[in-house]
Structures are given as C-alpha cells and as structure tokens.
C-alpha cells in the first residue's frame, strides 16, 4: 500500500514538474536578449488575472506593469501565459511599430484566432482577424464601402435614425418619465443606424414599443458580447493553442452566424428585386462585390466587420459621452450652442457640417480617450527588424514575436494628459488630436495601415446622435455610475446609466 501511495505521489510530482517546466520554459527569453522582464512573473505569466480572475480586466494587469516601468524603459518583456510579448511603454515607439515599421509588424494576434474550426467562416472573412495578403484584399474590399463620398451619400440614413431617436425619447418620456436608461438608448440608436446602412432594413429598435427589444438588437447584443468574451477566451489558450483545435473552438456562435446569413440573403434578394433600388448604402456595395465574384458568405463577413464597429463600440462611446456631458453642464451648453448655431441656417446639419464642428470634435475625441473601447493593440513581428531600446541599446526582433501597444494606458497617463481622469475637451483644441496621434499618445482607432476601418462610421453615428439629443434636450446626471471591467477588454461604466432628458423650450 505504501508503495502504491509513493508511486502516486511520484506521479503527481512528475506531472507538476512537467507542467511547471512547460509553463516556464520561455521565462528567460527576454533576459537572454538584454530586455528587462516585468516582475512579478508567475507560472501563469505577467498577467495572471487573465486566467484566474474573471472579474479582473486584463487592462488592470497591464496597468500595474505600465506604472512600474514606464519611467525607466521604452519597452519591457512580458508573457501572456507562456507567450513572450513586448509591452511598449514609449508612445513614440508605438508610432514606430504601428506606422513607420508597419511592414515588419503587419499582422495582429487576432489572426491566429481563426482557422481552428472550418465552420467559423464569418470571423475568418473579417480583415480584423486576417493576415498577410488576405488581410490586404479583405480590407480593400471593406473600405470601398466606407469612403467619405459614399458615407456622404448615405448620410440621410443617420439623419433619419436621429429623428427616430428623438421620437423614441419623447414616447419614453410620456410613458416612463424623463429619466431614461442611456446605455440601452445608445444601442437602440446604433442598432437602427447599422441595420439601415448595412442591410437596408428597419431594426425596430427605435420604432417599436418603449423598452421592447427586437430580434435584431437582441441578436446583435448577444453576438457582440460573445465576440469580446471570445477575445479573452482565445487569449487564455495561448498557454496551449492545441486546445482550440481539440475543442473546435468558435469565435462566433452557430446561431448568430445563421441569423446574419439569413438576414444578408434576404436583404440582397429584396434589393435585387427592386426594393431600395438606387440607394447608396453598404448593402449596395456588397452586391457590387458579389457581382465581381464574392459569395454571400463573403458579404456576411464584411457586414459583420462593419457591424461590430458601428453597433458595439459606437454605442459604448455614445453613452459614455452623454454621461460625461450630463456631468459637465458648462461643456454641454457650449456644445449645444455650437450645434444650434449650425442648425439655425438650414434646419438640419449636413454631412460636411457635422464633420467640421470643432467643439463637437473635441468632445468626441475626449470621450474616445476616456472610454478607449479598444484598450490595446497587439502586433506580430512578420519580418526581422531592430528597435531602439534607448541608452545605446538595440533589440533584434524575430518573426513571430508579439508586441502590445497599451492605448488605454497612454490615454490615462497623467504625464501625457494632466488630470487624465477628468473630462476636458479643451485638450483637443486647435487640431491637437492629429499631433497627439503622431506622437503615439492618442490611439482610439489604432494607427497606420491597420487603423480601424469602421472609424468614420463610428464617428458619424456618435456625432449624429449627440446633435439630435442636445438640440432637443438638456441632459442631467441622476446618480454616479462606477467604472468596472467589461469582458476583460476595457474599463467601462458598470451599471445602469440613468440620465434625465428635459425638453428644451424653443
């Protein structure tokens, strides 16, 4: 019996030793290359919270490392589980990686998330999850439907959504009072705008009963939530990538894939049958691509790429911006004055005007900075290159090594943005956003050739909603909402965002 117990203990010890050796095999990787390794370094890597604490955002673990080393080094060696990764502490180096040396860092870590399940085809059809020449082709196809000239022709879609938004607020005020949960309101607006722009349909999110959530909005909410949780789940499997194949892990669920396939097929058939003929929107672009040889599945992949940016991230920025303005009455009044002055001449704001209202732009950029919907950007070294570590030291990087650009940390660094936690739109006056981006300090959409392709759509959605709300209502904060982790990807308002909408006297 004692022999059996001893044998079992030996097996346990050996198994533990094997696991420990497997997890820590690379932990001298950065030391051997003359790069400081972030401490503490556990068997779970530099960011153990990603594996052991569901309620702790990866952003917080990165923040701890950033705070400890940012004043000492341009970059520091870290590990996501056992995967070696550089954390870029110097924004100037971030600009170099994202822009100047883009050809050496062309691919993203998300491109390694696909291909493990052949049925997960729509995520594989997104440039966000693609690499190499495939990324270049998919991005080119996608961007063609999002050019400024095309959005200008489609601007009436956003204007109509803005009018529906005001009508919905009025119905909500009559039925439930002036206090409206604004997170829900924001996503109702972005659901309506994206359904109309991408598929040419009325989602019913603003025209249905107050508080009722239709199939499109519900499916979009479930789909985007699953997409962000998949990001974290796939990051966790960096410790053992074979797990993805073993369990045929999917990024999007089968149910949502089927929903958006049916929706896209029906939309294409309706348009080709004469409904909405001559309309300039994203659906017309998808049909043009199909006429050149794209399949319906290619169209679904492109549609979902735009939808993720236009629905989820735009909605998040919108309710955060309204929350900030509700707390800062002076800034809200200044922005309202600018909007009303622009409205005075024509009765509505044109596409060109909405993109040339300086204070609206400042408030939008400050909201992007505070929210930072994409907290970090990960790039893969695709060609051998050398980076300057400072103090006459350089580092030779090999293909396959990943780097993290921590946009959230730059945006909330008091050395870059004094009183960084405060809402101060004046930070972005006189074209400061462009200057800060070139310094690598302002990266809400990333930078370089892989900059977020839904950037213009998101900007148009948020600005249009703000114009329609502030030209009709005074928005007041009813209670403080704490910040908290959300899907591990960022730090967002955690709880109901209840704001009071008081009709302006005209």
Curated annotation (Swiss-Prot):
It is a peripheral membrane protein. Keywords: Endoplasmic reticulum, Heme, Iron, Membrane, Metal-binding, Microsome, Monooxygenase, Oxidoreductase, Phosphoprotein. Its EC number is 1.14.-.-. GO terms for molecular function: heme binding; iron ion binding; monooxygenase activity; oxidoreductase activity, acting on paired donors, with incorporation or reduction of molecular oxygen. The keyword Transmembrane does not apply. Heme binds at residue 452. Its cofactor is heme. Its main location: endoplasmic reticulum. PROSITE patterns: CYTOCHROME_P450. InterPro entries: Cyt_P450, Cyt_P450_CS, Cyt_P450_E_grp-I, Cyt_P450_sf, Insect_CytP450_Detox. It is found in: Endoplasmic reticulum membrane; Microsome membrane. Belongs to the cytochrome P450 family. May be involved in the metabolism of insect hormones and in the breakdown of synthetic insecticides. This is Probable cytochrome P450 309a1. It comes from Drosophila melanogaster. The lineage of its organism: Eukaryota, Metazoa, Ecdysozoa, Arthropoda, Hexapoda.
